[in-house]
Amino acid sequence: MQLLEKYGAVVIRDRAKILLPTPRINSRAVKIMAQYQIKNVWFGAAAPLALMAGKLRKEGASNIVALSHGHEIWWARVPLLKIAFQKIVKSIDYLGYLGEFTKNEILNSSIKIKNQTEKFIQIAPGIDTNHFTPKPNNNGLVAKYQLEGRRVIVCVGRLVHRKGQDQLIKALPKILEQFPDAILLLVGEGPTKQMLFNTAKQAGVLAKVIFAGKVSHSALPDYICLGEVFAMPVRSRFAGLEVEGLGIVYLEASACGLPVVVGNSGGAVDAVLDQITGVLIDSSNVDQIAAAISNLLAKPDAAKQMGQAGRGWVIDNWQLDSWSKKFNKILIGD
């Protein structure tokens, strides 16, 4: 009801735990289109739901937009899935991509897709730079986590293998050699939490790692701003089939004025200007991770300049309002 009153949006739930383009979902989508006289369709994830695009087109959809993330890369690479993804691209009007890496990987996957370059258009989530903005340390959080006088390295993300939090923990002993007051603040929840706990224990740094858990969107800037450095050494998995789509949290950290240490996986390279807003590292190299973070801690003025440059870059290129207007123009012509 709140979404309807505020945005004019009707939310329709389905009993399926995972929404897939099954005959039942196709049929239900067609009925919803007819009920609300829908002509413009947006698929939040191109694969696999946009396989419904052809059916919806026949039923009256005049403009269909689908957004690609990191996982569409393996849809475009794996032989059988590639055929399905080619069908998706053929059936839609626009395929949104987060950054240049994702665009190029998908375009170069096949001639059939490359011949439809005109359908590709960048659509990024955008950053609310009023929400994600530099701010003084939250005294309550400083007291809660006993951070007074500590050199805080912050990482925000789901606790999953791709995000590379284990590599940060493995790099921590080398960082502590130079900065014994350093501490790693991990924000997020996920299936690798116990593994990360064990890794920290084995490395002898458990007392130097804080597992803050999941925090609300409203509180996230306060957590990010506790850090001097934001680091998340994301990595590619399964022979490059699982990659980081963009890493929006790097941009959120930049908007908060922090230098970012970014892993070289997939579209994460589009979320940093190497040596300007942060440092791009080989996420498989623990020594390189440790060196990048230590260098930023050792040169706080240079780190601050990177953070300031990052905020300026986000304001100029990743503002929520500008991306919202671009998306609305593509979808409904506003």
Where are these regions (language model features)?
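Acidic donor-binding loop of glycosyltransferase active sites
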Residues: C225-V243, L258
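Nucleotide-activated donor-binding/catalytic signature segment of Leloir-type glycosyltransferases, i.e.
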Residues: N115, L196-P221, V229
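Short His-centered aromatic/hydrophobic patch
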Residues: F43-L49
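Donor nucleotide-sugar binding/catalytic pocket of nucleotide-sugar-dependent glycosyltransferases
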Residues: K82, K90-P136, F211-A212
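Short hydrophobic beta-strand element within catalytic cores of glycosyltransferases
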Residues: F230-A231, Y250, A255, P259-V262, ...
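Conserved donor-binding/catalytic core segment of Leloir-type glycosyltransferases
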Residues: L147-K163, I169-L172
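Conserved acidic donor-binding segment of nucleotide-sugar-dependent glycosyltransferases
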Residues: L273-Q275, V279-V286, N295-D301
